[in-house]
């Protein structure tokens, strides 16, 4: 009973984390309207998160070996700089719908990666894979919302797929790291290497908006939200959930992202909740339940 209650709590934390991430598009859009680029927003939010994490977690600066330190750098790239840059840049070449469909399919690829890396047959049950596929179909229904209009763009779709694979690899790397290091230490390193590896971007596109921009309440407030809550706390809770639930269970929660985005858009922007959304949401929830019930070998 205690284990079951713990699993419910871990899932609630994962859902809440994904729900918060599903609302960040509003904050990002506000900041972009105030003159900040996606790369600048990423740099600032991760810098804020790193400074805050360093204040609470500073006794240990480096991993036990250079191999582990290299793994931390990969986490910072796949879960930070490369993920955010490829996702945001994809929308300059293709539609938001295409980008959302490809990026939100990362749980399916994470499941397949676990199957490839951990080859024993108990790792991924066929019913679990079917549950993940059902959730994937539900995600497609929610994102399309009854409008089957896709625009193929090789460059944009390739960038979106890069972001998708980045998050899947990030989740897989996190699984192999959480047994040796605390979620707080790993999260701090993710922020550090995320900021470090985005710096070459400024060689080609230097500069930040004038200081006056950052004194605006909407800019200051949204940067604090993205840095403190959406980055520091959410990455910390996400990494903790992966350590408790495992890669497949935790990453399947990403399918829930379009649901929270649509609900928030309905509340803030007045967008309509359609029968397609309800059907897709039902598929996502049922698929996640089936996949979770059959996740026996992966913990």
PLM feature segments, named:
Residues 24-25, 54-103, 140-141, 227-245:
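Specific transmembrane alpha-helical segments of multi-pass solute transporters/efflux pumps
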